[in-house]
């Protein structure tokens, strides 16, 4: 059995907190750790990221209320909606459109992740390799 070789950009996935994390880079070069969940249809940034980037996010986003949830929880909360948020994953540009940013503290976030990412990233590419042995995500 052959597997996809490790890309030149190296490993960009880690397993921590019993969950997969993607190492990404924001447009300003800042390193981000994002919870990677293929069961998640839309990406979002957590309050911790908002708190550290409040002025720039407030300037480019629009406030709105959303209702959503997950396993055994439904909430309505205020978010900031960004028209576009660009990152790089393994040196590959990714654009996340209509990104929700959590502006309220106190949710279930327990790690130091900047946010969550899932199928809205995966669906942008023709070929996505998730190699858990070598711990990398390759987007083509």
Task: Indicate residue ranges for each PLM-predicted region.
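Pepsin/retropepsin-fold aspartyl endopeptidases
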Residues: 1-140
